[in-house]
């Protein structure tokens, strides 16, 4: 028996079970899920047209999962068991800095490791830095945004139909019913800035891995990653409006883009096969028949 039929006419936690999750909210969830998938796909297509290889995109996906979802979380699980964790969580600023530090160290180290190893032979094409960033930030959007919104949409449809769902219960339904539909679009807005940041940081680490004299860009990327994550965590924990938080993140993202463009212009090299020299002299090779005729004519003249 479904949730609606089971509790019809009753109240549970202040929620009348005749109430349904608004269709507009479901549409917003599906739209956000689409954005999370579409943006990485579009970036992949664009960068392929610009000459990037396909491999960096997939390496970016794998690297994010390995370093952020596996290694970072395993390490964080260990640290959370230490006595010092109570001190960290009791101070919002300290917590924000530590959270940002974990993300920065693991994700930027993952980038650097990927560029130095599996993508070593692809470093001649700087477009691959952008392609990697699209994969790194894209898989994060798909996991954190698209997957979540798809599951929420399925739950909402099942709940409205009176069908029990493995994806949630009364509390989840009440949250979605009371939430304005536009709140469900914020994730999509946030992911656009996040992917932009990932691509920008990928450019910094790319040139750090490519040129030993630019190694300082690697620790800089860690600090920048720490900064943006710390700002988001601290503002959110302080109860600041979500729009102010997103505005701050977008300002930071724009600053990162400006920095990445500057680094790109100073360090970018064009592959020879990408842009052949227009003024290169053209060597004319004579056809064998023509060469033979000229040789014969020269012999007759000498005779």
Feature roles, as predicted:
Residues 13, 17-303:
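Hydrophobic alpha-helical segments at protein termini of multi-pass membrane proteins
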Residues 1-16:
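Short, Lys/Arg-enriched N-terminal segments with co-localized hydrophobic residues
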């Amino acid at each position: 028996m479904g949730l609606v039929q089971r509790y019809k006419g009753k109240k549970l936690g202040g929620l009348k079970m005749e109430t349904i999750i608004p269709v507009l909210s479901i549409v917003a969830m599906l739209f956000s899920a689409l954005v999370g998938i579409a943006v990485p796909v579009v970036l992949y297509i664009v960068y392929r047209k610009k000459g990037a290889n396909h491999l960096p995109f997939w390496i970016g996906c794998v690297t994010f999962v390995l370093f952020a979802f596996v290694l970072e979380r395993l390490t964080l699980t260990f640290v959370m068991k230490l006595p010092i964790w109570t001190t960290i969580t009791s101070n919002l600023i300290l917590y924000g800095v530590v959270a940002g530090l974990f993300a920065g160290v693991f994700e930027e180290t993952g980038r650097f490791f990927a560029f130095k190893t599996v993508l070593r032979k692809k470093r001649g094409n700087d477009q691959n830095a952008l392609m990697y960033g699209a994969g790194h930030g894209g898989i994060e959007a798909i996991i954190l945004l698209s997957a979540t919104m798809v599951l929420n949409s399925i739950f909402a449809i099942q709940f409205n139909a009176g069908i029990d769902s493995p994806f949630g219960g009364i509390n989840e339904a009440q949250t979605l019913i009371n939430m304005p539909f536009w709140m469900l679009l914020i994730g999509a807005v946030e992911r656009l800035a996040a992917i932009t940041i990932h691509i920008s940081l990928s450019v910094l680490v790319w040139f750090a891995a490519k040129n030993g004299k630019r190694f300082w860009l690697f620790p800089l990327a860690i600090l920048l990653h720490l900064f943006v994550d710390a700002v988001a965590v601290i503002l959110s924990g302080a109860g600041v409006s979500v729009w102010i938080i997103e505005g701050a993140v977008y300002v930071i993202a724009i600053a990162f883009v400006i920095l990445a463009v500057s680094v790109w212009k100073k360090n970018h090299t064009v592959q020879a096969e990408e842009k052949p020299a227009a003024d290169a002299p053209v060597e004319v090779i004579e056809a064998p028949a023509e060469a033979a005729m000229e040789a014969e004519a020269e012999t007759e003249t000498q005779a």
